[in-house]
């Protein structure tokens, strides 16, 4: 998710029965005021399936909120700067290299590529309007993938795999 989409999430956007999260708004800050708008593009409006462990974490988090209603924003009062500051704090404590909030989105997409999901599936999950955006940004060739291709072709050549 984009940071603005995350900041705009409301309790009603989480469907625990279906295991989904609906992205249909984005939050931006203009002249010190929070402004809820439509997401970046029309294709950014989407429903994301989330795994059980994440659902449980979200339930636990919601239980910590005060006076929860369907329209309660999950991260009310938080800003992009807040998340950036918390990331910076975590980076210093852990000693890892500097990463940004957007790096998490990029890492998620790259992991999905490595797991073998198609660019079309990944584009839908990320809310990209064009699959080419996903391909150009996240589907760059890795040496690891190239080695796997060569290994598999070798197995086909040796008759260890059918290739089908």
Model-derived features: where do they sit?
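Short, contiguous acidic/charged loop-to-helix segments that flank catalytic cores in large enzymes
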Residues: 35-45, 74-79, 95-103, 140-141
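Short, charged phosphate-coordinating catalytic segments
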Residues: 1-27
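C-terminal catalytic core of tyrosine-transesterase DNA break-rejoin enzymes
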Residues: 1-5, 86-89, 93, 103-130, ...
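Phosphate-coordinating loops and pocket residues in cytosolic domains that bind phosphorylated ligands
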Residues: 8, 16, 136, 140, ...
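Extracytoplasmic/periplasmic beta-strand context in beta-sandwich domains
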Residues: 19-21, 46, 72-73, 136
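Active-site/catalytic core of tyrosine-dependent DNA strand-transfer enzymes
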Residues: 18, 26-27, 51-97
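C-terminal secondary-structure termini that scaffold catalytic or DNA-interacting sites
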Residues: 18, 31-33, 37-45, 49-54, ...
């Amino acid at each position: 998710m984009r940071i603005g989409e995350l900041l705009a999430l409301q309790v009603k956007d989480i469907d625990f029965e279906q295991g989904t999260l609906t992205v249909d708004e984005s939050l931006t800050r203009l002249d010190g005021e929070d402004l809820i708008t439509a997401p970046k593009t029309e294709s950014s409006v989407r429903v994301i399936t989330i795994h059980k462990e994440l659902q449980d974490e979200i339930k636990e988090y919601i239980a910590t909120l005060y006076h929860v209603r369907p329209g309660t924003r999950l991260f009310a009062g938080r800003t992009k700067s807040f998340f950036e500051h918390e990331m910076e704090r975590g980076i210093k404590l852990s000693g890892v290299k500097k990463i940004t909030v957007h790096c998490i989105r990029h890492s998620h997409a790259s992991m999905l590529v490595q797991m073998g999901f198609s660019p079309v599936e990944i584009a839908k999950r990320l809310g990209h309007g064009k699959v080419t955006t996903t391909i150009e940004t996240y589907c760059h060739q890795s040496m690891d993938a190239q080695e796997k291709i060569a290994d598999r072709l070798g197995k086909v050549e040796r008759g260890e795999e059918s290739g089908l």
